Amino acid sequence: MTRPGRVSRARRKRLDKQRVVHAGVAVADRAGIDSLSMRTLADDLGVAPMALYKHVADKEELLDGMLDVVLGEIDLPAPGSDWKSAVRKRILSARQALLRHPWASRVIETRTRPTPVALAYIDAMIGMLRNGGFSPDLTHHALHALGSRLYGFTQDVFDDSGRQDAGAEPSATAREMAATYPHIAEMMTVIYHDAASVVGPGCDDQFEFELALDLLLDGLDKRRRRPTSDRSPAPGGSARPESAKPRA
């Protein structure tokens, strides 16, 4: 018979960051984010709390990793998809991920710096719009209009409080950003330094709110002008089949 001490040591040996992070997701899904602490997570894993700190520095790093798990559940669009269907699929998949993990939206609001996984996701979203013919400036406004928090990041990605002057040499961090996330770097350069931006440097909440409202109203007006039978999408997002349409 295996002694309890040996079982405990074996369990600790198998512990790694992925297991810790996924266990955190499971606890938050099951009992809510308020119930999650390093101690309750350790109890759930059957280890001492200090064992967790070998894999995550603190609860903040744990939460970052948990959000990365949620982002990893978001489907990638099929290769060759047009921008509209690609972005639509991405957003709908993101919505489903957030519905599966209701705590995630709340945690997103507390993040001050996106993780590399989040930055890669943002960069891919921007790339879809740029490849669809959107200018960097319009891409910036499109992200606001579509709802930045649905993508898993806050406006801190575009925080301009400590930005350099337009003529300053780019920092090592900026150069690294440009090499790793070229679409983000391009858009940030435009919205901070390009006079062609409709808003000017940084983000104007009132402008973005009004633009999103106008886009929504324009879209509703366009939908209103369609024939009645074409207005209501089916659950999958496409027009309802003929048999499902209301009869006159």
Annotated model-derived regions:
Residues 1-31, 35-40, 44-47, 56-63:
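Basic, helix-initiating cap at the start of DNA-binding domains
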Residues 75-120, 136-146:
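Hydrophobic alpha-helical connector segments
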Residues 18-26, 31, 61-77, 86-96, ...:
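Alpha-helical structural segments
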Residues 1-15, 75, 186-196, 228-248:
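N-terminal intrinsically disordered/low-complexity leader segments
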Residues 201-230:
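A hydrophobic membrane-anchoring alpha-helix module
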Residues 121-173, 190, 220-224:
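Hydrophobic alpha-helical bundle segments that form small-molecule/ligand-binding pockets
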Residues 171-201:
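C-terminal lobe substrate-recognition/regulatory segment of protein kinase catalytic domains
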